[in-house]
Amino acid sequence: MSSSTNLMLKKLLALSLITSIPAACAYPSISEIKNPPEVDVSVNKEKAIKLEVVEKKWTCPTCNYNEKYVLEKLQEKTKISDRNALATIMGNIKSESNFIPNICEGGARVNYNQCHSGGYGLIQWTSIGRYNNLGKFAIKYGYDPSTLEGQTAYMINESVFQRYLPEFEGPGKTVDQYMVAAYYWLGWGIKGYRQHYAYNYTKKMILA
């Protein structure tokens, strides 16, 4: 067989290989690119696994029950999310009552209607108006005004707290800055250790 014949056979063989490439290996046409085939994205609802987004909250593992309860309700019933803001509120409550709801100013542990002078409760409600409103709120919503649950609900819903709530809900401030809003909320006469307590809470609280 001559060399020219061999060369021709090789060319024919190469051509046959090229033309026999499967269509799946070829590039898609313009129409296929513009109109891609539909993809089945249906879901079997019975077998589908629901993904739940768990929102993290500030917790205080070393705090007592009363402290944990108030911290939880502050986040559940408001939009406060800043650790310094929460710690400031907690520090002020600790300074006022040490989270003891049935405490009358001076230290006596009595029911709501047995505290006849000074402040009473978690934040030591002192003025006649604020003290009486605690009782009215409790009656209206079925709480005992001497309890942690009743006083926490009143504290969060009280008009004075609601007035300054936006200051606490605004994030990014220092404890010292949030303390200004706390002063107008509580109107304390003696600052005492409340800011020191607040800083301690910032160290004890964790996001979980």
Identify the function of each model-found stretch:
Residues 84-100:
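Short, functionally critical alpha-helical segments immediately adjacent to catalytic or ligand/cofactor-binding
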Residues 4, 38-44, 99-103:
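Poly-acidic low-complexity segments
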